[in-house]
Amino acid sequence: MQKVMNDPEDLGNCKICLQRADGIHFAVSSCRACAAFFRRTVILKLNYTCKEKGNCTVEKSLRNLCRSCRYTRCINEGMKIELVQLQRDSIGRKKSGASISIDPLFTPNVASSLSAIFKNEKEDVLSTSCTILSQMTSGYAMFLNIRRSTNTLVQSSVITPTFKMPKIELHASRFDSAKQVCKAEAHLVTDIVNSYFSPFNSLKFEDKVALFKNFFCYFSHTDRAYQSFKQFESDNLNDKILMPDGGFIKRTELGRFYENAEGVHTSAEDAAKIFQPALNYILDVIVDYMRRIHIIETEYLALLGFCLWDDAVPGLSKEAKSLAVQTQSKLLAELQNFYSSQNKDAVEITQRVGVLLLLVPKLTKCVIMLRENSVLAELFNYYEADVCCKNFKEDASVDLDCTSQCIVHTKND
């Protein structure tokens, strides 16, 4: 008599990896991890190559070693590609209590998929009458949502359709996971800037590359400082800085960040010595200054706008320089209007703008320090920088050896 598969206890083992199955996924009794792997492979159209002869063992403890054989097993056991398509198209119509399993082996392409979903949700909200700052606010909110999602993808295998993450206790960050998320973050930021940091999208490709390469270094380190300030605002003795992977680095334990990391070729202590001064500077100068002036998000985004629209960036066309100057003026005007709406008088507005802009040279010094530290670390082969991070060096040419399509990795056809 054929077994009825309605009771989870009657599902038996996963047909793919042989661990306990928890449901019928894509017409096959399987576990969430294998279902998520199959879904991700199909949606992102990933191709795998077996390094052996196509007969690798696929079981719970070894299922991640050969993705080619794992995917082949999925197909051979009867998983249906067309069912993945149907489920993907109905993401927005699922009940908020449901969950989608995502394979934790995260790639930047997943970030692009998440970005597309969020963008579709936001497009109806934005209108052509939005100011530069309000568009940036919407884009930054979407960026934070996606980044929380990418952190969860790296740390676990479950994500809700609405991408509202449960509160997770802070954990000590590690080099490998931070590098993984940072690589994805670079692609996310290109998409956010291109879509929401008006009028960036109107620039020629070469001008986009020049401005973005300069901007991303500012954004990456400034956002760590800003998020650290927000997280530990009331703690004047805070000695931790938040990292892109959702974890933190403690000032006195920087060496732990580099322990047992695949891309680090020296001792954790030696790697820490290279970057300790920059970490101290971020905490003692930038985060401390943000705390003293009680910076708010609108001011922070205006600051990012000034860093992006730098007309002194080498290689800009005349048109781009002119647009940068115009956008700077518009940002200043919008910032003044914002302060006026907060009932500040002319003197208070002038003082506040001055206090805010005094942060820019501090950010510039931090960027210079970190660039010099990175060059030194690579010179002595202390660690391996991924291809995306290498592209953001001041004197680096654009390296197109990247699987994702973003501003700094796409040729101008």
UniProtKB/Swiss-Prot annotation:
Zinc fingers (NR C4-type) by residue = 14-34, 50-69
Q: Which Pfam families match?
A: Hormone_recep, zf-C4
Provide the residue span(s) of the region labelled Required for zinc-binding. 101-412
GO cellular component, alphabetical, reads:
cytoplasm; nucleus
Q: Where is the NR LBD domain?
A: 135-396
Q: What happens when the gene is disrupted?
A: In the presence of excess dietary zinc, reduced transcription of genes such as cdf-2, ttm-1b and mtl-1, which are required for zinc homeostasis, and retarded growth as compared to wild-type.
Q: Which GO terms describe its biological process?
A: intracellular zinc ion homeostasis; positive regulation of transcription by RNA polymerase II
- Please list the residue ranges the record marks as binding DNA: 11-86
Q: State the protein's name.
A: High zinc activated nuclear receptor protein
